[in-house]
């Protein structure tokens, strides 16, 4: 949903990324840490309170948490106690959809890009150290402890522009939090919001563009070189795995204590492989989005097997391996439309998945080296 004020006349010359929730799924892999920490003090996390802390600098977040939960600690003591719990999990954080593609594209075309995060610099370095080539490819890296004030102050973005020798009005900021979006606008920069909480997208109207995922990003709208990496009307993506129970065309995803294993930024119409009850493997089209109806917001995953009717599949265990992106999902108001598979979609699925690089056997061989347990493998 690339929208609103995209303007190629802006002549964007550099890009500034946020880190947590924008480039990396750190917020997802560490979401249980606060719950475990608060349990020691007889407290339970409040989701509404945690939403307001999205994007906060470490110091401000610590003060806010201690006050909100009335902890018998100073903010400094809280930080000293909780931070070691994070260190071991950062290595599990994965690049979010479209991130490696975009950074590689910018590097290939000589467009400088920087990293500006409300984390302190030491923690930034620890997080990105698990991703080969990342640190070396940023023209500048800034943490909240390297400027006078963290976001929503514009200080960090202005300093990043200065270090890249680019005027602020020629910089494009990519952010997942409202705090970060406000900082980018205060710096006089164009801002693309990719909300890490998709149910909150209505709050991001000050951004110049709002996307569900960086897979949707179109650099040519900002005067940057266009992507040319689609194959047979499909965009190859890093494999994404989903497991659950399939019935009546819908996949009920297995969740951990009410949390999805998927980042909110996995959104759109995908193609891939569906494995039924650990036996039959079929080509499939998968629609992923959110129903934002009234007070209930939930992810909706629809799957359509291409060469066999869905009607024969009821209450079965299904494992999906997404390997290609087709387009955005369709909405009517706040409701995700039922999946309608066009004949051209079927042709795209067959053509793409028949390519040797995306055959199921080839992907099995590739994924056998993955450190994450892969129940998709035979």
Predicted feature descriptions by range:
Residues 64-101, 109:
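Metal-dependent phosphoesterase signature
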Residues 22, 34, 81, 99-129, ...:
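Substrate-recognition element of Asp-dependent hydrolases with the DxDx(T/V) motif
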Residues 40-43, 69-73, 132-137, 165-166:
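Short helix-capping segments at alpha-helix termini
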Residues 238-378:
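Phosphate/ribose-recognition catalytic cores of enzymes acting on nucleotide-derived substrates
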Residues 44-45, 57, 167, 190:
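Short coil/turn motifs that cap or connect alpha-helices
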Residues 1-12, 104, 120-237:
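Asp-based, Mg2+/Mn2+-dependent phosphohydrolase catalytic module
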Residues 37-38, 57-72, 127, 161, ...:
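Helix-loop "lid/cap" segments that line or gate small-molecule binding pockets
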Residues 2-51:
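Active-site neighborhood of HAD-like aspartate-dependent phosphohydrolases
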